[in-house]
Structure formats: C-alpha cells, structure tokens
Amino acid sequence: MGKDVVVLIGPMGVGKTTIGKKLARALKVEFRDTDAMIVAEHGAIGEIFAKLGEPEFRRLEEVAVASAISEPGVVATGGGAVLSELTQSRLGSTTVVYLSTDGRHMASRLANGNRPLLQNGLDDWRRIYEERKPTYESLADITINTSNQTMASALDEIKTRLTKND
C-alpha cells in the first residue's frame, strides 16, 4: 500500500463502514469511522443536525476527518464529508477509494437507519447522490462499483487495486 491512509468515500448506505472494517482487518491496520468519532464526542448525528444545524455538523466532520487521516489506517467518511473544500484538499495525501452504486439495493440498506438528510427516503438519497457524484469521482484514486457484487467481492477488488496502485 503506497500511501499510509486509505479513505473510503461514497453515498450514505453504500457500505463504507462495513467494507472499511474488513479492509482494515485484512491490511492489519487501524480502522476509523468519522461518523462514529463525531457521535462518540458530540452525540447522535440527528440531534446535532436538529440542535446545531448542518453547517456545524460539517465543521465537526472536517475536524473528524483531519484527525482520522493523521494516522495510518483505513477511514470511512460520512457521505457528505467531501463537501468541504478543506477536506477535499486534505484527502490529497491519502488513497481515496470511491464506493459507487447504481442505487438498486439502497432502499433496503437505508430502511434501518436514522439519517437526517433523508426525510423523503430514496428520492432524497438519489438527489443527494447525483449532487455529490461529480465530487466523489474527482477525488477518487480507485472507483469500485458495489452494485452487482457482494461486500466480499468488493473487498477483494479493493485489495487488488490497492496492490496495483503501489
């Protein structure tokens, strides 16, 4: 692995945390999830949005990403972390893996989550994803389409592509 930090980006619910944990285990490195870091320090994301608003959440997210990428390992970001230009520039020192999807399986993945930006469910998810997709694509060193493969095969593809990027 050429760069010491692998950062997983992509839309909410695509599997960044699930794949990230397994990837970190396979690479024998630490795993950090920026959403979990925010929750541990500041409380539930939904409550942060309700009490402090999205701009404050995004500021907390910038801090979490900066902290997470300061040490070697695998990092899963929140879906909107890439909205920050500061975060975008910081990701330049990492290997960015974009987990893409066509959205066909997202309804079941999103059904069991409390996501403050998805008041209208899958329609909101699609709109947000289309808005962010160009940013995900521009930041990616590696793109993995998760639509037609299992998490295990996506993980194998990431490991193979990371080895090729060395």
Role assignments for model-derived ranges:
Residues 1-2, 18, 22, 26, ...:
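NTP-dependent small-molecule kinase module
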Residues 8:
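Hydrophobic anchor at the beta1->P-loop junction of P-loop NTPases
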Residues 11:
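P-loop (Walker A) phosphate-binding loop of NTP-binding proteins
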Residues 15:
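Conserved glycine(s) of the Walker
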Residues 25-34:
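Post-Walker A helix-loop "phosphate-sensing" segment adjacent to the P-loop in P-loop NTPases
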Residues 33-81, 85-89:
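ATP-dependent small-molecule kinase phosphotransfer cores
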Residues 79-82, 102-104, 149:
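Short glycine-rich anion-binding loops that position phosphate/pyrophosphate groups of nucleotides
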Residues 93-135:
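A glycine- and Lys/Arg-enriched "phosphate-lid" helix/loop adjacent to the NTP-binding pocket
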